[in-house]
């Protein structure tokens, strides 16, 4: 109450932000008359003037008003479109490391040109990021004339480009592309073997379209570059046959309840658990099939892999449904995006789940993948110096944007008042009653000529409605993962008089639904249309547009509430664009998954009290509130999952940053001779200390062991015992120096034989290849550690703390092994000439050619912390512009100085 009162008096934070930015809008508008008088050449010259002023010390804030005024004037001349004041506000929000919530149809694409131009002037690169290749290409080509008129270059970064084309795209002032491609390019750059192979410049400014989709919905999906691991397809097929014989039970066993089934399903957490009986039954079945030794346990250390396969098969059979979570096409299992309803060819679930689903469906089982490099979108995008985004629905996720990314959300007002009528939900007892009411509503709209967009949450639902509409003889279009080829065309015509369109979730997002149909597409369909033809198409469209408005505008019809309020708001937001008329209503039943899992008891109780009959619906604010509370619960749970994933990935990210920074330093260096000498001293000294402990008696020295180790690992054939017998003055320090001198002499002789330049190249190649191999093994070890870390909760230990501690130990091992392996290889390998270095490089390229990209879903199951009550707030990683100082604390969190920890490599 007090908060509302204060907001009334002082205005909300959003109002104050808009008021401050409004002052700059006044400045931009004041410049308009002067800029209209400039010739095209004078307007273009402004870009050079701005660049000169930036070089002379002015900031982007100093030139913002003038730059935005230039873009507005250029837009009028190139597109015959004048950005509204609210678009100027949106552009300023995007330039200030914030998220702009702009309603559908408010011109986000044109708004993005303002901050893109301003930041493009710097020459450091602007990345405009969209959700798919179609939108990236469309927006780049649409805006290219404007940017090129102002002297800025435009690049497009989509899948399938070669290295040269990618380099060109990234070297442009403004680069349009998809989140996947930018992320994959970052990982590929950090697997490169020479500076020339890298395509990205330092990450400067990212402007993300549909920011909620990329930073929220995709945040649980790490980008993974992987290579094929060992073939275990036969094992998946065998274990798949065991699962149908297992019996489900309603809930988990507890002290008060012991069921009779073999497994229980937790629908809220999307988990499945074997009961004790189920475990015994599976063990007996495995013994019968000869896959488990008599008397052995599924949970013994030697059978962890078998347990992994059983769990994957169980999840595939119980939690993943065909035509909802995936489709089978051409003997291949293709994931369906739960947020958009689109298929995602090339993406695979991780941890054997995809293979288990393939076995379940009788499709070809593909090999498991081994991770070579990975990063979450959260940690990729937080590396940008400036980050901003825009969407039609961000306010419900404002806390997460601020908490994870440090981005404030600003709701930008609409250019015209919004007049869409959002009607209360109608709740029915059963699904058939709900669908009967939906068909009746559609028939009513058809009679009025009002276009209808029906939003469904799954392919299965859209196909059910498809058949019901066919039975009712209602003409309609279907847009789901199976019919996505004509997506833009279907969505663009969804506003035609009397049109009925069924779409899964937010399919077609990014394409406006124009009332009366899209006249632009009609013009584009003609070859070389004349001015008369264009005028006639526009005139005909105006008549249709007015007819649709008179019929009530676009009617949005939701067949089920989504887990997230934001997705529901996105569906509603398709209607009422630019002040048009429109309406929306959701139809629900007690059999819907959200209602069944989260809101059933309370709402069912209300319905029973009201004594509802078949076909009757309930429409009450209490019901809407209960549904909204259910959605809040799901949103909170999903946020915790994303936050937890980030907390784990932050540990890996600290290590990733150290390894990638070291790797880039090695690659950019002319010579790493000093690094090799430092490592050689560390390694040899460490080995000497093992066999000749510091400050120990000579009787405790293991000289034969030291001679053997130096000979076997480093090719140093030394007679240390003879040295000691002949020289009484030798002690541990002088002995260490003599051994180091011997290694240096051996290495010097090798250098004289092959030449310094060849050896320097070989050193770099060995260092990079060894680091890459060990990093790959380290990632696999980290994956295994994370999958089992939740079990530490049963031992009353904090799983996250244990994960941090053990991953740090693994990283220390990686560094030690790297140093030993590099010195061992350099000591023993005989380099004859440049051809040996070239051959090594060619072998590396052949291996790289075998690598395939896989974009995989993270397994949330491995992140559930058993026994942990509280979830720590993740630390926001701020991108540092400066290099880490040698005496600064190491970023890995060990508490040691950088030079004594991960800085040892440099």
UniProtKB/Swiss-Prot annotation:
May bind 1 zinc ion per subunit. Its EC number is 7.4.2.8. It is a peripheral membrane protein. ATP binds at residues 87, 105-109, 512. Keywords: ATP-binding, Cell inner membrane, Cell membrane, Cytoplasm, Membrane, Metal-binding, Nucleotide-binding, Protein transport, Translocase, Translocation, Transport, Zinc. The keyword NAD does not apply. One of its GO terms (cellular component) is cell envelope Sec protein transport complex. Its cofactor is Zn(2+). Zn(2+) binds at residues 890, 892, 901-902. It catalyses: ATP + H2O + cellular proteinSide 1 = ADP + phosphate + cellular proteinSide 2. Residues 879-906 are annotated as: Disordered. It comes from the Bacteria. GO terms for biological process: intracellular protein transmembrane transport; protein import; protein targeting; protein transport by the Sec complex. It is found in: Cell inner membrane; Cytoplasm. InterPro entries: Helicase_ATP-bd, Helicase_C-like, P-loop_NTPase, SEC_C_motif, SecA, SecA_CS, SecA_DEAD, SecA_motor_DEAD. GO terms for molecular function: ATP binding; metal ion binding; protein-exporting ATPase activity. Monomer and homodimer. Part of the essential Sec protein translocation apparatus which comprises SecA, SecYEG and auxiliary proteins SecDF-YajC and YidC. Belongs to the SecA family. This is Protein translocase subunit SecA. It comes from Shewanella frigidimarina (strain NCIMB 400). The gene is secA.
């Amino acid at each position: 109450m007090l908060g509302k009162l204060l907001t009334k008096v002082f205005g909300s934070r959003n109002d104050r932000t808009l008021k401050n930015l409004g002052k700059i809008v006044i400045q931009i508008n004041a410049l308009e008359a002067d800029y209209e008088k400039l010739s095209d050449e004078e307007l273009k010259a402004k870009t050079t003037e701005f660049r000169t002023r930036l070089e002379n010390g002015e900031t982007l804030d100093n030139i913002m008003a003038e730059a935005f005024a230039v873009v507005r004037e250029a837009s009028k001349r190139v597109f015959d479109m004048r950005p509204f004041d609210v678009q100027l506000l949106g552009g300023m929000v995007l330039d200030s490391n914030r998220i702009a919530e702009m309603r559908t149809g408010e011109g986000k694409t044109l708004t993005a040109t303002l901050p893109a131009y301003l930041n493009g002037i710097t020459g450091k690169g602007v990345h405009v990021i969209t959700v798919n290749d179609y939108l990236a290409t469309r927006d780049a080509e649409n805006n290219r004339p404007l940017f090129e008129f102002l002297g800025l270059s435009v690049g497009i970064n989509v899948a399938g480009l070669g290295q040269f084309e990618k380099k060109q795209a990234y070297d442009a002032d403004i680069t349009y592309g998809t989140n996947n491609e930018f992320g994959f390019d970052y990982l590929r750059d950090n697997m490169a073997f020479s500076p020339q192979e890298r395509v990205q410049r330092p990450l400067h400014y990212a402007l993300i379209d549909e920011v909620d989709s990329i930073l929220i919905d995709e945040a649980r999906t790490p980008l993974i570059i992987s290579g094929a691991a060992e073939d275990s397809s036969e094992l998946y097929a065998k274990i798949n046959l065991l699962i149908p014989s297992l019996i489900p039970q309603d809930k988990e066993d507890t002290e008060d309840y012991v069921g009779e089934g073999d497994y229980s399903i937790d629908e809220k957490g999307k988990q499945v658990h074997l009961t004790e009986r189920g475990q015994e039954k599976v063990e007996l079945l495995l013994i019968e099939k000869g896959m488990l030794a008599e008397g052995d346990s599924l949970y013994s250390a030697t059978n962890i892999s078998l347990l992994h396969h059983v769990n994957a098969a169980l999840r595939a059979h119980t939690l993943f449904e065909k035509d909802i979570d995936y489709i089978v096409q051409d003997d291949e299992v293709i994931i369906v995006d739960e947020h958009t309803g689109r298929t995602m060819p090339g993406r695979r679930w991780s941890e054997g789940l995809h293979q288990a689903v393939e076995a379940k469906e009788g499709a070809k089982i593909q090999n498991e993948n081994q991770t070579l490099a990975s990063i979450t979108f959260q940690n990729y995008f937080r590396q940008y110096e400036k980050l901003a985004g825009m969407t039609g629905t961000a306010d419900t996720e404002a806390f997460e944007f601020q908490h994870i990314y440090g981005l404030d959300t600003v709701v930008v007002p609409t250019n015209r008042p919004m007049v869409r009528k959002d009607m209360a939900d109608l709740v029915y007892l059963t699904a058939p009653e709900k669908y009967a009411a939906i068909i009746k509503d559609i028939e009513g709209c058809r009679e009025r000529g009002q276009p209808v967009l029906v939003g469904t949450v799954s392919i299965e639902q859209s196909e059910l409605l498809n058949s019901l509409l066919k039975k009712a003889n209602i003409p309609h279009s279907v847009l789901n993962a199976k019919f996505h080829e004509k997506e833009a065309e279907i969505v663009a015509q969804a506003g035609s008089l009397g049109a009925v369109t069924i779409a899964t979730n937010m399919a077609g997002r990014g394409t406006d639904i124009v009332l009366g149909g899209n006249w632009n597409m009609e013009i584009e369909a003609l070859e070389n249309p004349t001015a008369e033809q264009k005028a006639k198409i526009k005139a005909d469209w105006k008549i249709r547009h007015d007819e649709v408005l008179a019929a009530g505008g676009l009617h949005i019809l939701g067949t089920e509430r989504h887990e997230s309020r934001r997705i529901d708001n996105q569906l509603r937001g398709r209607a009422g664009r630019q002040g048009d008329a429109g309406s929306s209503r959701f139809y629900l039943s007690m059999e819907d998954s959200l209602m069944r899992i989260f809101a059933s008891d309370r709402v069912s109780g209300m319905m029973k009290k009201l004594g509802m009959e078949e076909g009757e619906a309930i429409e009450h604010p209490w019901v809407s509130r209960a549904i909204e509370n259910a959605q809040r619960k799901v949103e909170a749970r999903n946020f915790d999952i994303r936050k937890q994933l980030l907390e784990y990935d932050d540990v890996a990210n600290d290590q990733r940053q150290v390894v990638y920074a070291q790797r880039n330093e090695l690659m950019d260096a002319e010579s790493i001779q000093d690094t090799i000498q430092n490592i050689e001293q560390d390694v040899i000294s460490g080995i000497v200390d093992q066999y000749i402990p510091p400050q120990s008696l000579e009787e405790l020295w293991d000289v034969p062991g030291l001679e053997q180790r130096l000979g076997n690992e480093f090719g140093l054939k030394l007679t240390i015992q003879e040295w000691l017998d002949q020289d009484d003055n030798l002690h541990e320090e002088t002995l260490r120096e003599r051994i180091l001198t011997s290694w240096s002499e051996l290495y010097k002789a090798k250098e004289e034989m092959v030449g310094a330049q060849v050896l320097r190249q070989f050193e770099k190649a060995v260092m990079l290849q060894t680091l890459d191999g060990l990093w790959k093994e380290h990632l696999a070890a980290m994956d295994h550690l994370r999958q089992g870390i939740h079990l530490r909760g049963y031992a009353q230990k904090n799983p996250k703390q244990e994960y941090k501690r053990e991953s740090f130990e693994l990283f220390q091992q990686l560094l030690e092994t790297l140093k030993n392996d590099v010195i061992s290889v350099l000591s023993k390998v005989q380099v004859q000439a440049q051809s040996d270095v070239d051959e090594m490089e060619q072998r590396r390229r052949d291996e790289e050619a075998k690598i395939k990209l896989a974009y995989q879903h993270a397994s949330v199951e491995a992140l559930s912390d058993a026994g942990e009550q509280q979830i720590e707030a993740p630390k926001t990683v701020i991108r540092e512009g400066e290099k880490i100082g040698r005496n600064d604390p190491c970023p890995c969190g060990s508490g040691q100085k950088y030079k004594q920890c991960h800085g040892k490599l440099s």
